[in-house]
Amino acid sequence: MEELNTIKLSDHLTPFLTFNRQQWAELRKSVPLKLTEQDLKPLLGFNEELSLEEVSTIYLPLARLINYYIEENLRRQTVLKRFLSGHNPKVPYIISIAGSVSVGKSTSARILQSLLANWPVARKVDLITTDGFLYPLEILQKKNLLQKKGFPISYDTQRLIRFLADIKSGKKNVKAPIYSHLTYDIIPNQFDIVDRPDILILEGLNVLQIGSNKSNQMFVSDFVDFSIFVDAEEDQLKEWYIKRFLKFCRSAFTDPNSYFKHYANLSEQEAIETASQIWDNINGLNLKQNILPTRERANLILKKGENHKVELVKLRK
C-alpha cells in the first residue's frame, strides 16, 4: 500500500490519519485470526450480528497497533524502574472505549479483550464497565436524576477515579461495583476484583469526559493510555436503539424481576413510540450534550455504518 493512498491531503488539516476499510485491513499484515465463530458468538451484543470478517478487517489491525503501544510503554517502565532502582510497581495499560448508547461499545470491548488476551505475548486482560460506578437507584431517585441516568452527573466519578488510581498504583485486588441491567441498579455487596492485570479495558459512555466540576483536578481520561471512540450517525444509533428495545420487550423485560417489566405488554407500535421518546429525551440528549463533544479527544475513532460495520478508522497522529 502506497503511503500517498493512505494519507489524504485533508489529513494535514486534522490531528487524525483517516483509513477506509481496505486500507485499515492491510495493516493487519500477517497476524493470524485465532478467534472462531463459536468464540465470537458470546462476545456479541444483544442486537448485533458481527462477522469474523469484521474482526479480521477492523479489530486485528487495532490489536496489532495497541500491542506496539504496549511494548513501547513497557520500555518506558523499564527506564523508570532503572531510574528508581527497581522501586516502581507494575503499571497496567489502560484502554478506554467510549461512545453512545446502542453503538456497540461492549461488543468492541469484549472482542478487543479476547484478541489481546490471546496474543502471542501472554497478557492478563480485564474488562470493567463504568455502569458499576453509577449512583445506586435510591440516590438517583432522591436527587431527581433518573431522567439523567447515563449523564456525567449520574456517576460517582470520584469513586471511579479512586478505582483507577488504585489500579495505576499497582494495588492488589481492587474492587469494582457490579451493575445489573435487569434490576437497573447496583448489586449490593458484589464486586468484580481487578488484580494487577497487564491491560485494563474500561468501557463506558463518558470515559473521555473532562467534567463540569471545576474543583476536580483529575479526570478519568488522565489515567487512560489509549482511548477509542465508537461512532455512528445519530439516526443510525436511534434505529439500533429502537430495534434493541423491541427485542428486550420480548425477552428481558418479560422477567418479573426486571425494572422495565411494565414495557413487556406494549404493542409493537407502542414500544417503538416509547423507545423513540426515551431516545429523544434522554439518550439522544446525552449524546449531543456530553458524549459527542468528547469524540475528538480519542486516540482512535471507529466510524460505523449499517449493520455495525466500521466504514472509517481515524487514528491520532
Swiss-Prot record:
Annotated catalysed reactions: (R)-pantothenate + ATP = (R)-4'-phosphopantothenate + ADP + H(+)
Q: Does the keyword Nucleotide-binding apply?
A: yes
Q: In which pathway does it act?
A: Cofactor biosynthesis; coenzyme A biosynthesis; CoA from (R)-pantothenate: step 1/5
Keyword list (alphabetical) reads: ATP-binding, Coenzyme A biosynthesis, Cytoplasm, Kinase, Nucleotide-binding, Transferase
The EC number(s) given in the record are 2.7.1.33
Which residues span the membrane?
A: none
Entry GO CC: cytoplasm
Task: Give the UniProt subcellular location, in the record's own words.
Answer: Cytoplasm
The record lists ATP as bound by G99, S100, V101, S102, V103, G104, K105, S106
User: Which GO terms label this protein's molecular function in UniProt?
Assistant: ATP binding; pantothenate kinase activity
Q: Which GO terms describe its biological process?
A: coenzyme A biosynthetic process
NCBIfam families from the xrefs?
A: panK_bact
The family classification in the record reads: Belongs to the prokaryotic pantothenate kinase family.
PANTHER family xref list: URIDINE KINASE
Q: What is this protein called?
A: Pantothenate kinase
Gene source species: Histophilus somni (strain 2336)
The gene from which this protein is expressed is coaA
